[in-house]
Amino acid sequence: MAIALVTGGSRGIGRATALLLAQEGYTVAVNYQQNLHAAQEVMNLITQAGGKAFVLQADISDENQVVAMFTAIDQHDEPLAALVNNAGILFTQCTVENLTAERINRVLSTNVTGYFLCCREAVKRMALKNGGSGGAIVNVSSVASRLGSPGEYVDYAASKGAIDTLTTGLSLEVAAQGIRVNCVRPGFIYTEMHASGGEPGRVDRVKSNIPMQRGGQAEEVAQAIVWLLSDKASYVTGSFIDLAGGK
């Protein structure tokens, strides 16, 4: 069929999305930064179920590594048809007055620059004017982009606000090139990311404030991502789906 690249595909939302895309017939490129074992586990689950997958190591904040990752995809016979920009980082909960430039820049380099670089390389390959066959991109933002994450991680929230704007701008740039660009904004999902923020049980702490009174599962986000990438969403671009239980 075609290749779908999932950045940060070894855990959480990325993992769930990779598994679901394989079920839809994509050959899945599972990107990871550090945990080769986890990425290989995803690949093995896919191949054992009769699907196709391969793993690619890259730190998306590093331009050379991003270019190398897409060059590796070019070596495969199938074209790149889908990009899920999912890799992201989050640091320990902290107020703005205690943030350092180093922390802010690390968050932005992965969560913003990394997304831009992956979009750039995907567009080069998908655009009709470049001989591509079109494609679809889904950026994984966060409901934090409009809630702001006060007292927790405004830096992370701001990085996701940038992704919302990237989605809008890029969708308009490439709509005539056969490329659709959409965005999901998860919130309060049971993933390992909350441990990175220093509070593994955060979802359970805040779920009473969520209108639906529960946290979400990575698979619920994956369903929305896969729909946006599919032909069922063929007239959808520049759109946002919030998956945050009503928040």
UniProtKB/Swiss-Prot annotation:
EC code(s) of this entry: 1.-.-.-
Keyword Repeat: no
Pfam hit, one: adh_short_C2
Residue runs in coiled coils: none
Highest taxon listed in the record's lineage: Bacteria
NCBIfam families listed in its UniProt record: PRK06123.1, PRK09730.1
Keywords carried by this UniProt record: Oxidoreductase
Family, per entry: Belongs to the short-chain dehydrogenases/reductases (SDR) family.
Record-annotated active site: Y156
Residues annotated as binding substrate: S142
Gene: ygfF
Protein residues bound to NADP(+): 4-28
The species this protein was found in: Escherichia coli (strain K12)
Enzyme class: oxidoreductase
Gene Ontology molecular function: any one: oxidoreductase activity, acting on CH-OH group of donors
Identification of the protein by name: Uncharacterized oxidoreductase YgfF
